[in-house]
Amino acid sequence: MSDPVFFPFAGPISLGEVAALAGAALPAGLDGTLAVAGAAPLESAGPDDLAYMDNAKYAEALGRTRARACLVSPRFAARVPEGTAALVTPQPYRGFAQVLARLFPSAARPGSLFGATGVSPGSFVHPEARLEPGVVVDPGVVIGPGAEIGSGTVLAAGAVVGPGTRIGRGCAIGPGASLLHALVGNRVIVHGGARIGQDGFGFAMGAGGHLKVPQVGRVIIQDDVEIGANTTIDRGASRDTIVGEGTKIDNLVQIAHNVVIGRHCVIVAQVGISGSTTLEDYVVLGGQVGVVGHLRIGMGAQIAGSSNINKDVPPGARWGGTPAKPVREWFREMTTLKRLAARERGPEDTDG
């Protein structure tokens, strides 16, 4: 549940405004000035709350909800109970997100831990750093010489911005994050503990020992990227590591040197991408996917969680497994193995 201690409430919102934000249609005869004062799941929503539903698994909960209004896709609209206004929209979840951002704006991105404005006297900002008006700098932040920070950007406690690093406007850098050797666009969110721009893992290996290869590239992060907590993005070896516009990266992801990630990709937790691999636009990697280096994953490809990629993936493909292959082929192999195992199982095979 939302707790006003953590997420201050911005005030009630009328159903008319909800519909406008969510791209939904108000039912005929519904008073659009009626308001909701919160948001909650179907099963716990009360008469002042907004809920949403776009998954058949929750059809039963929809039929019992007590919410004042529910954002719902057309296929489920008839199941909304009396007493709950059905706000029909093709994308209920997306609409719900937009309403939540209006009700609880501080939850949309990391902010100052002190609710502060301006530059805290407990921070260290090098005299040669350049900060535009409206930058918020918490205590414990370190900003190196030649760094540039755009207006409206918030640096939470303990964040580190290295020499020469540039961060655009309207960004949010979470507590304890570090950004070195990086060029960051506008409206970028970096969650706490993320590490951007450290050494790539490069060694010239040999019998006489492993010689470290200096990493002299940068990290370039384009507009509207979000990077999860404790994710690490290595700077390039001799070219840049790039994260494209609108890409969303979960927590605990490792992105190696020289990786190029296209626009609007989604990378789920615990993914590891080896060096010099390219993801084209709109690629989705499920949790714990491992990608070998020097590969190309084509535009719009989707990789199932826990898969391992050891060769190029064509555009639009859906792959899974270890090693990964087209999903239909993977499913056929799994079904065949299951049949063979069942046929060969003896009476002593009783575990599980």
Curated annotation (Swiss-Prot):
GO biological process, one term: lipid A biosynthetic process
Top enzyme category: transferase
Phylogenetic lineage: Bacteria, Pseudomonadati, Pseudomonadota, Alphaproteobacteria, Hyphomicrobiales
Signal peptide from the UniProt entry: none
Family: Belongs to the transferase hexapeptide repeat family. LpxD subfamily.
Entry annotated with the keyword Acyltransferase: yes
Catalytic activity: a UDP-3-O-[(3R)-3-hydroxyacyl]-alpha-D-glucosamine + a (3R)-hydroxyacyl-[ACP] = a UDP-2-N,3-O-bis[(3R)-3-hydroxyacyl]-alpha-D-glucosamine + holo-[ACP] + H(+)
Gene Ontology cellular-component terms listed: membrane
Functional note: Catalyzes the N-acylation of UDP-3-O-acylglucosamine using 3-hydroxyacyl-ACP as the acyl donor. Is involved in the biosynthesis of lipid A, a phosphorylated glycolipid that anchors the lipopolysaccharide to the outer membrane of the cell.
InterPro entries named in the record: Hexapep (IPR001451), Hexapep_transf_CS (IPR018357), LpxD (IPR007691), Trimer_LpxA-like_sf (IPR011004), UDP_GlcNAc_AcTrfase_non-rep (IPR020573)
CDD domains recorded: LbH_LpxD (cd03352)
Catalytic site positions: 257
Residue ranges of the TM segments: none
SUPFAM superfamilies in UniProt: Trimeric LpxA-like enzymes (SSF51161)
Pfam family, one: LpxD
GO molecular function, one term: N-acyltransferase activity
Assembly and binders: Homotrimer.
Protein name listed in UniProt: UDP-3-O-acylglucosamine N-acyltransferase
Enzyme Commission designation: 2.3.1.191
Keywords for this protein: Acyltransferase, Lipid A biosynthesis, Lipid biosynthesis, Lipid metabolism, Repeat, Transferase
Pathway as given in its UniProt record: Bacterial outer membrane biogenesis; LPS lipid A biosynthesis
